Amino acid sequence: MNINKIALIYNHNSKHLAIIEEIKKLYNYCKIEEAEVIIVIGGDGELLHNIHRYMHLNIPFYGVNLGSLGFLMNPLDTKKLLQNIHESTVSILNPLLMQVEDTSGQIYTALAINEVSIFRKTNQAAKFRIEVNGIERMSELVADGALVATPAGSSAYNLSASGPILPLESNMLCLTPICSFRPRRWHGALLLASATIKFEILNTNKRPVNATADFQEFNNITNVTVKSTKDKPVKLLFNKNHTLEDRIIKEQFGG
């Protein structure tokens, strides 16, 4: 990959400003709108926020990890930064499109790179009905919540909720309950990426529910529809010896 123009994004309140200043001195950077690659320094959260902010530009993102986990990031190598970008591999992520309706009848849409989640707002468990492609698959799930995860997001919140990890090219989605009470032994479902999943919230007055698309939260919802979209693909760059697919495989063996 031949790259001449790169933009740099970082948190100006970062505790790693000394390292960031070193990177800034080594290379020349351009405006984000003019870039061929956007470098994001920080952790997964910083990267996700900036993907949402700039994904409309259709510019590849290269994350440099100065956070904790950094699953979507690359290890810091200041002097080989440009070389690693030139030699990087591209992973295409298709986000989830979430549409929610709240108790006032307002409808909102949002995109998620990792997952869409719905969860109880009070101490009482949520109750909801699940449809897949217009067919009722569960008349009542009683749980703390549920989530739909992309392959890239399957090793995040989904894994913590005991959902399976999906290979990046699997063309599937995870539907995973969060602390399911009834049916107690239901552990979720694997669905084709073309599926449309709908959650209808039951007893919203007594058991209010919120929904999130990554970090965007919506309150007091009555229904949520989730589907994958190929209209807004996200390009992530990874070092050739540290690809996202390799990381996903490693996670499945406890790595």
Swiss-Prot record:
The EC number of this protein is 2.7.1.23
- Give the intrachain disulfide bonds: none
Protein origin, superkingdom? Bacteria
Q: What is its main location?
A: cytoplasm
Q: Which cofactor is recorded for it?
A: a divalent metal cation
Q: Which Pfam families match?
A: NAD_kinase, NAD_kinase_C
Tell me which Gene Ontology terms the entry assigns under biological process: NAD metabolic process; NADP biosynthetic process
GO cellular component, alphabetical, reads: cytoplasm
Relate the protein's function as given in its record: Involved in the regulation of the intracellular balance of NAD and NADP, and is a key enzyme in the biosynthesis of NADP. Catalyzes specifically the phosphorylation on 2'-hydroxyl of the adenosine moiety of NAD to yield NADP.
Q: Which family does it belong to?
A: Belongs to the NAD kinase family.
Listed name of the protein: NAD kinase
Species name: Rickettsia conorii (strain ATCC VR-613 / Malish 7)
